Amino acid sequence: MASTGRVLLLSPPSLSSHPEKLNAILGSHTRDRTDLQMLDRLVHGLVSLPASTYDIVLLLTGADNTLAEPYSLVTRDIIQQVVHSLKPAGKLRSQDNKAWGLRSSGNNSDDDNDNDELTFRNEAILAGLVFDDNGELLKPDVAAQQAVPLKLGRRKKEKERRHPSGNDVTNGKVNAPSSNGVNASTSTATATATTTTTTTPKTNPAPSGVGFIDFSDDYGVPMEEDPQGSDDELIDEDELLGEDDMGRPIVQPPECRPKPGKRRRACKDCSCGLSQKLEAEDKAKRATADKALETIMAPTMKLGSSELAEVDFTVQGKVGSCGNCSLGDAFRCDGCPYIGLPAFKPGEEVRLLNNDVQL
């Protein structure tokens, strides 16, 4: 099973307690071109995989010689890291050397292993892998794909072919020779060709590095009346994700993860879900604070609109024991009943309505 390319072995943690099995697997590969990583270290983010490095990533079986343990550890984030580490045209294989495209479809809901295989296969496809002719998971080589040219202006060309202009055909054929001995039909055709050549409009070349698409022949043609219209179907983006996908936890990209002890702010055009997460946390904290405030304020006595406390200072010289009640808080004693009220003139009527001062 030795390979000439660079190989990455993904080992479940149970093999660490069976070194004889792990050594046997390592012995079947070229040691200087083989790397070994433990799945649990990848899951906890203790190690990271280099980009576009491996030709083959081999998923090892557990101590029970099944893929049940690796399936339970491999998440969408791990598969994305594996795909990122594969070279173009690199393959993801399993130790049992059975292609995932040839495995059971997983329709038997009683078989948990089939369901795990189906989930793993779907996650691999969502991460960008495809099946080759042998049913193996392959990372497509995007650079090798050919570009399809856009053939625009076909309606204009068909219209010119069906209804040619008058400059391209003669109005009639005259076989009588002219005065200079040249056939009239030949001279007419020559003149027509000369006219066509000289009247061809000159087009200004497009600026370097700028591409232009001519949609002038498509104006005014409704889509339902277009016999050769595009076959593209409109896709409802809400149907692309199911209930299981919506219920999955949000995987935060490494660049969006905050530093220890700090809270990272969401980007202005956040698309990873961090903005919604922070907004939900703020709402929860605000609701908790409001509830705690209501609990504290519950035993406090509150005066209704019909309850009015009136302090009468119409009598001159009527002051408190300190004699500074009307001067303001800076001059009032600690037990003054008017602490918090603005300064007022002796003899002025002060009303307290719903804890609001009305002079």
Swiss-Prot record:
Stretches of Low complexity bias are at: 184-200
Residues annotated as binding [4Fe-4S] cluster: C322, C325, C333, C336
Chain residue ranges for the region called Disordered = 97-116, 149-210
Motif span (Cx2C motif 1)?
322-325
What does the entry list as the binding residues for [2Fe-2S] cluster? C256, C267, C270, C272
Basic residues bias (residue ranges): 152-164
Q: Which domain of life is it from?
A: Eukaryota
Q: Where is this region: Fe-S binding site B?
A: 322-336
- Provide GO CC annotations from the record: mitochondrial intermembrane space
UniProt entry tagged with the keyword Mitochondrion: yes
Q: Where in the cell is it found?
A: Cytoplasm; Mitochondrion intermembrane space
The annotated region (N-terminal SAM-like domain) lies at 1-148
Q: Which residues form the signal peptide?
A: none
- Where is the sequence biased in composition, kind Polar residues? 167-183
Placement of sequence motif Cx2C motif 2: 333-336
Keywords of the record: 2Fe-2S, 4Fe-4S, Cytoplasm, Iron, Iron-sulfur, Metal-binding, Mitochondrion
- Name the protein family: Belongs to the anamorsin family.
- Domain text: The C-terminal domain binds 2 Fe-S clusters but is otherwise mostly in an intrinsically disordered conformation.
Under which name does UniProt file this protein?
Fe-S cluster assembly protein DRE2
Q: What is the source species?
A: Blastomyces gilchristii (strain SLH14081) (Blastomyces dermatitidis)
Gene that codes for this?
DRE2
